[in-house]
Amino acid sequence: MSDRPTPARTRFAPSPTGYLHIGSLRTVLFSWLWARHTGGQFLLRIEDTDRKRFVEGAEEQLTSSLQAIGLMWDEGPIVGGPHAPYKQSERLEIYQAHAQALIDKGVAYRSYATADEIAAINAEREARGEPKLLVFRNLPGIDDAAREAAGADYNVRLSLKTTGQTVVQDLVRGQIVFDNAALKMPDPVLLKTDGFPTYALAAMVDDHLMGITHVLRADEWIPTWPIHHQIYEAFGWEQPVWVHVPQVLGSDGKKLSKRHGDTSVTEYIDLGFVPEAIINYLALIGWSYDDKTEFMTLEELIERFDLNRIRPSGGVFDRDKLLHFNGVYLRNMAPAELAQRVAPYLSKAGLISAEPTAAELAKITEYLPLVQDRLKLLSEAPELLDFFFVDPQGYDPALLVPKKGDPAQTVEILGQVKASFEAVETWDAPSLDKLLHDFVNQLGLKIPQVFMPIRVAISGRTTSPGLFETLAVLGKAVTLARISTAAAALSSASV
């Protein structure tokens, strides 16, 4: 008999106000993993009811970010589903009907006081040393009945409990008890004068109607949790499993911000971080499988993810550690797969075609093992591989001549090496290794006197992949041509 949990329905419900940031992605990942672990469904819902903060194009950025990172949704925009529409601005009648239902139950009311009137009353109360308003009906100087009869605009507010306790259960922190009298929270707006709902109403209604079983969200929602809990109670609905995950912190222990590296997910991908590394690393911020396992495939994360292992304390996002994870993934990636990943960066650098050919991909696959150990970001590939595709431009004589070396002698050595290479029949790394070491020994030279000029001649730099392996993959013709060019450049500079 399987001990697999009951299939869960989780969701990501972003507001289209900007990009999906790396800190937010961690919470999304937890929701996605739990749905996959239980064999359930992960929903995407767009909470676009705050029209003042709405940013054109943000929804497309959010969906493309999830697609780029590989966290596809089972229901929501693009894919549809039985609970469509999945955009809250297209569900206004649903929220309006539920707001009216709460009014009918006597747990919500229409407030006809305008924002200016409330501000004026609060100013007067403050001058008298009284606290600000918590309830917004039957206010002095405002005739609610007359305004209702005149068809005036109104907000719908929830009548928060002011006695007793609101007892909530969180999977991470356990039971939390709120003293309703001590909350001192103003009755929250559920429906605005423009007919649009607030988060408090829309999110709770949608979570219930869409069958969300587990609500995973940041622990910064805990202070306003009594509102959401009381809305569920007012409707008589079963509460979902509430899971308040710890904040993602910066290296200084403060909430993650842009200065810590909390930039958009697409920016990280554009820089050359691979989804596998991002997902693996983020999964470990606030959660762990055990005390020692760090590297896990997506399949392993799905199999091992358990909400009960989420820690209540915040986890630190360390960009350097993410970079380390990324390097490990790149080093362990099959060259053919890695070639596909670096190809767009090589294309952008003008080293290969915009649409890479099979021959170009084969070449990249051949070159990559020589630099793979040094690769930490896909975007570093053009700098590491450029000399395989284009000849070095403008040799620096200071680089061609070894320390304490002689330019004329170096030109002579390059000429002798070229002659030796021309006679080579088997052009591979072992043969070239033997040939060059024999060459050094026979002439009584030191290795740097020979190897350094060759390295600079073929790559244009003093640091490159293994010399013999590089010579082998560049091929005989390219090697001879570059040595000739380098020798000529040095000879001209020495005149």
UniProtKB/Swiss-Prot annotation:
Belongs to the class-I aminoacyl-tRNA synthetase family. Glutamate--tRNA ligase type 1 subfamily. ATP binds at K258. The lineage of its organism: Bacteria, Bacillati, Chloroflexota, Chloroflexia, Herpetosiphonales. One of its GO terms (biological process) is glutamyl-tRNA aminoacylation. It catalyses: tRNA(Glu) + L-glutamate + ATP = L-glutamyl-tRNA(Glu) + AMP + diphosphate. It comes from the Bacteria. Monomer. Keywords: Aminoacyl-tRNA synthetase, ATP-binding, Cytoplasm, Ligase, Nucleotide-binding, Protein biosynthesis. Its EC number is 6.1.1.17. It comes from Herpetosiphon aurantiacus (strain ATCC 23779 / DSM 785 / 114-95). Its main location: cytoplasm. SUPFAM superfamilies: An anticodon-binding domain of class I aminoacyl-tRNA synthetases, Nucleotidylyl transferase. The keyword Disulfide bond does not apply. PANTHER family: GLUTAMATE--TRNA LIGASE (PTHR43311), GLUTAMATE--TRNA LIGASE, MITOCHONDRIAL-RELATED (PTHR43311:SF2). This is Glutamate--tRNA ligase. InterPro entries: aa-tRNA-synth_I_cd-bd, aa-tRNA-synth_I_codon-bd_sub2, aa_tRNA-synth_I_cd-bd_sf, Glu-tRNA-ligase_bac/mito, Glu-tRNA-synth_I_codon-bd_sub1, Glu/Gln-tRNA-synth, Glu/Gln-tRNA-synth_Ib_cat-dom, GluQ/Sye. It is found in: Cytoplasm. Catalyzes the attachment of glutamate to tRNA(Glu) in a two-step reaction: glutamate is first activated by ATP to form Glu-AMP and then transferred to the acceptor end of tRNA(Glu). A motif ('HIGH' region) lies at residues 14-24. A motif ('KMSKS' region) lies at residues 255-259. It holds the Pfam family tRNA-synt_1c.
